[in-house]
């Protein structure tokens, strides 16, 4: 496995652990969201919204951790061509999608719904999502090269 993929796996685990902590915080005290994220409209944050946010964050955390454990899930042993690789890449792409979804969510809360301001509490998840998207897109190239080289060895 390439060094880049090992770093990406470590990054995904770290982000997953942080997300698990945010999940606990969302369930423990919903004022966490109004004080750190949705600062432009803190009155809209209630317990139900915080728990929903917590469940979403927990789901993202689990998906990201599973991808870190099995980052090659997108390259099956029987991959014969690029189409086969794409068809078997669900967990990697779902993980990538969790970061796109987080990025779109926070950007829309800031620029469309105006419930969040560009504070450090919002900038942090925006930067994590952006760096993660970039890293996972680069990781796709490494995984593709590995899959193609493994395929050549088998033939």
Where are these regions (language model features)?
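Hydrophobic alpha-helical membrane segments
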Residues: 78-80, 92-109
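Cytosolic juxtamembrane helix and N-cap/initiation of the first transmembrane helix
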Residues: 1-19
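Juxtamembrane loop-transmembrane helix junctions in multi-pass integral membrane proteins
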Residues: 2-6, 40-48, 72, 82-89, ...
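Hydrophobic transmembrane helix segments
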Residues: 17-49, 54
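Membrane-helix boundary connector in multi-pass membrane proteins
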Residues: 69-75, 85-88, 103-123
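Juxtamembrane interfacial secondary-structure elements that flank transmembrane helices
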Residues: 24-36, 62, 71-75, 84-90, ...
């Amino acid at each position: 496995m390439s060094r880049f993929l090992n770093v990406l796996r470590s990054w995904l685990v770290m982000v997953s652990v942080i997300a698990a902590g945010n999940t606990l915080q969302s369930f423990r005290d919903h004022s966490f969201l109004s004080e750190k994220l949705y600062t432009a409209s803190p009155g809209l944050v209630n317990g139900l919204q915080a728990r929903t946010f917590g469940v979403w964050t927990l789901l993202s955390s689990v998906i990201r951790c599973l991808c870190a454990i099995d980052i090659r899930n997108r390259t099956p042993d029987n991959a014969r061509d690029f189409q086969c690789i794409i068809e078997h890449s669900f967990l990697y792409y779902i993980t990538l999608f969790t970061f796109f979804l987080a990025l779109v969510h926070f950007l829309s809360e800031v620029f469309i719904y105006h419930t969040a301001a560009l504070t450090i509490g919002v900038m942090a998840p925006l930067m994590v999502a952006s760096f993660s998207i970039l890293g996972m897109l680069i990781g796709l190239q490494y995984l593709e090269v590995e899959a193609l080289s493994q395929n050549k060895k088998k033939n």
